[in-house]
C-alpha cells in the first residue's frame, strides 16, 4: 500500500514533457477498483509513457548535447516494451554520424518525430548502441568511430547551416557633443555623428550598406557611404559571391577597394586550422574616447572606449593587408592618430586545400579627386604534398600590372615560413613606365607547451616597384601627382608569452624605411595580470622618426600607461553591485603626467553602468584637472549613453543612442546594436525575459528581441533566464542552438506555455472518475492540435498548466477510449497558488 501511495504522488506531478521520477513495478488491478480499461503495461514493467523528455546526450563517453527528445514505445526481443529515442537525420549529422554511408538508417523504421521527421534505426550501424537512463535523464549512445566524422574545430557540419529568415535589418548609432571653452573669451562648438547600417536578407542573399553623417559647428552635415554590396555564400564550394563595394584580399597583393564583382574562398566556412587571422588594433585612450579605424580612407569601425588600454578584436574582415589608420578622439577635444601595420601570416595550407579569389571591377578610392580605373585580380593558393604550398596571382589595371609567385613550407613543430615575390610594371601620371620587384619572407610559430607565439616578417622593394594603389592614386583631376613616400623596406616582429598565474606579456616592434630616406621605428610592450581579483596592466610604446622631414620635437614619442582595477566587494560586502575602483597613470612625451582615480559599477539589474573619474595633471598651464561622469543604460530596445566632464576652462557633454531593428514576417523586433549575424529570439507571451547574460538584453512585450554575438557556421547556444519569467509562464527548454550562415537572421524559437495552473478533477457523465494513467491533453485554439499536458492520478485529478480561463481538454486511455471535457476556472486560486476545479468528460 505504501508503494502504491508513493506512485500516486509521483504521477500526480507527472508531466510528459518535463519529468523527473523513479521507476517502480506494481499491479494495475489494485488501482481504479478494476474499472481500468487503460493500458498500463509500460508502468507495470517499470517503464515510462511515450512522449518528449529532456535528456543529456552522452556519445562514446562524452556529453555533447542537452535537448528535448521524442521517445516512442517499442518491443525488445523478449517482448517487453521500452522507450526508444527518435534520432532524426539532422541530430545525427550534428553529432558527426556519417548518415550518407548507411542508406537504410531511416528506411527500416516507420516511426516519425512530432515534426514528421524520420526516426533512425541505429541497429543498421554495426555495434551501435543506445541506452536511455530515465532516472539520470541521460541518453547514452555508442557509435563506432568508423561511423563518425573527424571532429571539426570551430565549425558545424554544413547540413546544419541555417540561412535564416527574410527580413529588413537596421543598426544605428547616433552621438552628439557640446564643448565649451571658458577663458578670457567664451567659445563653444557642437558636433554630431550618426552611423546607419541598413540591410536586407532574402534567403541566402544579403544586401548591406554603411552610411555615416558628420556635422560640426559652422559647417554643413556631410554624408559618406562607405559601401553598399550584395553578397551570398556558396556553401557547396565554400566560397562567397559579392557584387558592389568591397576590398580585394591581401594574402599576396596589397588590398585595394573596388566596386564590381568578386568570387572567392570564404574562410568562415572552413575549420580554424585552415583560417587566416584578422587584425587587432591596440592603443591607449587618455579619456573616454571614440576610436575610428579607417582603411584606404573609409571608416570601417567606430567604438567608444573607456580611459586606458584598448584592443579592438572584431574589426570587419576586409582582407586589407595595408596599414590601418586609427583616430583616437578624446573627450577633451584632443586627437591621437597612428597607423597600425600588420602583416598577413606565413602561407602554409593543408595538402589538397585550395584558396582562390577572382575580382573584376573599378578602383574605388576614398578621395573623389582620384580618377577611376578598371582593375582585375586573380590569386590562388594550393596545398601540395611534402608540406609545401604554392601560391601566385596577377593584378592588372589601365596603368599597372603585377605578377606574384611564392612558396610556403610547414615546418611541423617549428612553425611555418613562406617566401614570395611580386614583379610590377607601373606608370605614374606624367612619368614613364617603371619596372621593379619586391620580395618578402614571413615566419610564424605558436609553442602550445610554453604559451609562446612568435611572428616575424621582412619585405624589401627595389626603386622601381610600386603597388597598384601607388600608381592609380597619382591620377588626380587631370594633374600629375607623383608618389614619393613609398615604403621600400619593412621589418616586423611580434612576440606574446603566457606566464600562467604570473599573467602575460607581449612585445611588438618594427621599422619602416621610405624612398625619401625617412625611417620610422616603433616598439611596444605590455604586461597584464590578476591577483586576488585585482587586475593591473602596464603598456608602453615608443615611436621614433628618423629623417630631415621631422623636426626635433617630433622625432621620438614615448607613451607609458599604468592601470589597476580593484573590486570593492571586500569592503562593501556581498551586495557591492559590482563596484570597482580604478587608478591610472599616463605619461606621453611632451605632455604632463596624468593621474586618474575612479569608481564604476552597475545598478538596476546590470542595466545601468556608471563611471566616475577624477583626473589630475600637475604642472599643466591650462589647469587641466578634470572631473568626468559616464553613464550607459542597456535596455531591451537599445542603449543610451551620456558623458559630462568639466574643469576650470572647459566643459563637455556627450549623449548617444544605439540599437538594432528587424522587420520580418512575424512583425518588428528591436534590440541592442548587433553584429552582421544575429538571432531573433521568439518566446511568445514571455515579456522581460533576460537573454544570454548580456546586460539589458531582454524580450519585449510580445516575447521577442534581437541578439548579436553569434558566430556564423558555428553552434551558438541562446539561453533564457527562467528566474526572469513572469508568473504563469513556462518554457519546456530554456536554451536553443542556432547555426547561422554569415549575415543571417536565424530564429531561436522557444516553446512557451502561458496561462494558469490548475488541479482538475475529471469525471465521466455518470460521476465515476477517469481511470488512473489517463493522458490529458489541452486544446489551444479551435482547430489546433491538442498538446500533451498531464496524467490522471487514482483520484481522477490531473495537474495542468498553460490554461486559459476556459477551454477544452481531451482525455485518452486504453486502446480506443477517449472523451472531451469543457472546463472553466474559478475566480480565486487555492491555498497552494493554483486553481482547483472539476470538469465532466463526455
Swiss-Prot record:
Intrachain S-S bonds: 819-841
MF term (GO), any: fimbrial usher porin activity
Keyword entries, A-Z: Cell outer membrane, Disulfide bond, Fimbrium biogenesis, Membrane, Plasmid, Signal, Transmembrane, Transmembrane beta strand, Transport
Membrane topology (UniProt): Multi-pass membrane protein
SUPFAM superfamilies: FimD N-terminal domain-like
Gene Ontology, cellular component aspect: cell outer membrane
InterPro entries: Fimb_usher, Fimbrial_membr_usher_CS, FimD_plug_dom, PapC-like_C, PapC-like_C_sf, PapC_N, PapC_N_sf
Signal peptide: 1-21
Principal location class: membrane
Family (UniProt): Belongs to the fimbrial export usher family.
Protein name: Outer membrane usher protein AggC
Species assigned in the record: Escherichia coli
Gene: aggC
Amino acid at each position: 500500500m505504501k508503494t502504491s501511495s508513493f506512485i500516486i504522488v509521483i504521477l500526480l506531478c507527472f508531466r510528459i514533457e518535463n519529468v523527473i521520477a523513479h521507476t517502480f513495478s506494481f499491479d494495475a488491478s489494485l488501482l481504479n477498483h478494476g474499472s481500468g480499461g487503460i493500458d498500463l503495461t509500460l508502468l507495470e514493467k517499470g517503464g515510462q509513457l511515450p512522449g518528449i523528455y529532456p535528456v543529456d546526450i552522452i556519445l562514446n563517453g562524452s556529453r555533447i548535447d542537452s535537448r528535448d527528445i521524442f521517445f516512442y514505445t517499442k518491443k525488445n526481443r523478449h517482448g517487453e516494451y521500452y522507450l526508444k529515442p527518435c534520432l532524426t537525420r539532422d541530430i545525427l549529422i550534428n553529432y558527426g554520424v556519417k548518415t550518407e554511408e548507411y542508406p537504410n538508417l531511416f528506411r527500416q523504421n516507420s516511426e516519425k518525430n512530432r515534426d514528421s521527421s524520420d526516426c533512425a534505426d541505429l541497429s543498421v550501424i554495426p555495434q551501435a548502441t543506445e541506452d536511455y537512463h530515465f532516472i539520470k535523464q541521460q541518453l547514452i549512445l555508442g557509435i563506432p568511430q568508423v561511423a563518425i566524422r573527424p571532429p571539426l574545430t570551430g565549425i558545424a557540419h554544413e547540413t546544419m547551416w541555417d540561412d535564416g529568415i527574410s527580413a529588413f535589418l537596421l543598426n544605428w548609432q547616433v552621438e552628439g557633443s557640446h564643448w565649451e571653452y571658458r577663458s578670457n573669451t567664451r567659445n563653444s562648438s557642437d558636433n554630431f555623428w550618426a552611423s546607419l547600417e541598413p540591410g536586407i536578407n532574402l534567403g541566402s542573399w544579403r544586401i548591406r550598406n554603411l552610411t555615416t553623417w558628420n556635422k560640426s559647428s559652422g559647417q554643413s552635415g556631410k554624408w559618406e557611404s562607405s559601401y553598399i554590396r550584395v553578397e551570398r555564400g556558396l556553401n557547396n564550394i565554400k566560397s562567397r559571391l559579392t557584387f558592389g563595394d568591397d576590398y580585394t584580399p591581401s594574402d599576396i597583393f596589397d588590398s585595394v577597394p573596388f566596386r564590381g564583382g568578386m568570387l572567392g574562398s570564404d574562410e568562415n566556412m572552413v575549420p580554424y586550422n585552415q583560417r587566416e587571422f584578422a587584425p587587432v588594433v591596440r592603443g591607449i585612450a587618455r579619456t573616454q574616447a571614440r576610436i575610428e579605424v579607417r582603411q584606404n580612407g573609409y571608416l570601417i569601425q567606430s567604438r567608444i572606449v573607456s580611459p586606458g588600454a584598448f584592443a579592438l578584436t572584431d574589426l570587419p574582415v576586409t582582407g586589407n593587408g595595408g596599414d590601418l589608420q586609427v583616430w583616437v578622439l578624446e573627450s577633451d577635444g584632443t586627437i591621437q592618430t597612428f597607423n597600425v601595420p600588420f602583416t598577413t601570416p606565413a602561407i602554409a595550407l593543408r595538402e589538397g586545400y585550395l584558396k582562390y579569389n577572382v575580382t573584376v571591377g573599378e578602383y574605388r578610392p576614398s578621395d573623389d579627386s582620384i580618377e577611376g580605373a578598371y582593375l582585375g585580380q586573380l590569386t590562388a593558393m594550393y596545398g601540395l604534398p611534402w608540406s609545401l604550398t604554392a601560391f601566385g596571382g596577377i593584378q592588372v589595371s589601365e596603368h599597372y600590372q603585377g605578377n606574384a609567385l611564392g612558396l610556403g613550407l610547414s615546418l611541423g613543430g617549428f612553425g611555418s615560413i613562406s617566401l614570395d615575390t611580386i614583379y610590377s610594371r607601373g606608370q605614374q601620371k606624367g612619368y614613364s613606365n617603371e619596372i621593379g620587384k619586391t620580395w618578402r619572407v614571413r615566419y610564424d610559430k605558436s609553442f602550445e607547451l610554453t604559451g609562446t607565439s612568435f611572428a616575424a616578417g621582412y619585405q624589401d622593394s627595389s626603386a622601381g616597384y610600386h603597388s597598384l594603389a601607388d600608381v592609380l592614386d597619382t591620377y588626380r583631376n587631370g594633374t600629375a601627382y607623383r608618389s614619393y613616400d613609398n615604403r621600400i623596406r619593412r621589418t616586423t616582429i611580434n612576440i606574446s608569452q603566457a606566464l600562467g598565474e604570473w599573467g602575460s606579456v607581449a612585445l611588438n616592434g618594427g621599422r619602416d624605411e621610405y624612398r625619401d630616406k625617412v625611417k620610422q621605428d616603433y616598439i611596444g610592450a605590455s604586461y597584464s595580470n590578476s591577483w586576488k581579483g585585482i587586475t593591473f596592466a602596464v603598456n608602453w610604446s615608443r615611436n621614433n622618426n628618423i629623417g630631415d622631414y621631422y623636426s626635433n620635437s617630433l622625432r621620438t614619442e614615448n607613451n607609458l600607461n599604468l592601470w589597476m582595477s580593484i573590486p570593492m566587494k571586500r569592503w562593501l560586502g556581498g551586495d557591492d553591485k559590482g563596484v570597482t575602483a580604478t587608478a591610472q597613470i599616463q605619461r606621453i612625451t611632451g605632455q604632463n603626467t596624468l593621474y586618474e582615480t575612479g569608481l564604476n559599477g552597475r545598478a538596476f539589474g546590470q542595466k545601468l553602468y556608471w563611471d566616475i573619474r577624477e583626473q589630475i595633471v600637475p604642472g599643466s598651464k591650462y589647469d587641466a584637472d578634470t572631473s568626468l561622469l559616464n553613464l550607459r543604460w542597456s535596455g531591451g530596445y537599445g542603449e543610451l549613453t551620456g558623458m559630462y566632464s568639466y574643469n576650470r576652462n572647459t566643459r563637455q557633454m556627450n549623449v548617444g543612442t544605439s540599437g538594432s531593428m528587424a522587420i520580418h514576417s512575424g512583425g518588428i523586433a528591436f534590440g541592442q546594436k548587433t553584429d552582421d549575424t544575429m538571432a531573433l529570439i521568439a518566446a511568445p507571451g514571455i515579456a522581460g525575459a533576460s537573454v544570454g547574460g548580456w546586460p539589458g538584453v531582454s524580450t519585449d512585450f510580445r516575447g521577442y528581441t534581437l541578439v548579436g554575438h553569434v558566430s556564423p557556421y558555428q553552434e551558438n547556444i541562446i539561453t533564457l533566464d527562467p528566474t526572469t519569467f513572469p508568473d504563469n509562464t513556462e518554457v519546456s527548454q530554456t536554451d536553443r542552438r542556432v547555426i547561422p550562415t554569415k549575415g543571417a537572421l536565424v530564429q531561436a524559437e522557444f516553446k512557451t506555455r502561458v496561462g494558469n495552473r490548475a488541479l482538475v478533477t475529471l469525471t465521466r457523465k455518470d460521476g465515476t472518475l477517469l481511470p488512473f494513467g489517463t493522458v490529458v491533453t489541452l486544446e489551444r485554439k479551435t482547430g489546433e492540435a491538442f498538446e500533451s499536458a498531464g496524467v490522471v492520478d487514482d483520484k481522477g485529478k490531473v495537474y495542468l498548466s498553460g490554461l486559459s480561463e476556459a477551454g477544452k481538454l481531451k482525455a485518452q486511455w486504453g486502446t480506443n477510449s477517449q472523451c472531451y471535457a469543457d472546463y472553466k476556472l474559478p475566480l480565486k486560486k487555492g491555498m497552494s497558488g493554483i486553481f482547483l476545479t472539476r470538469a465532466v468528460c463526455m
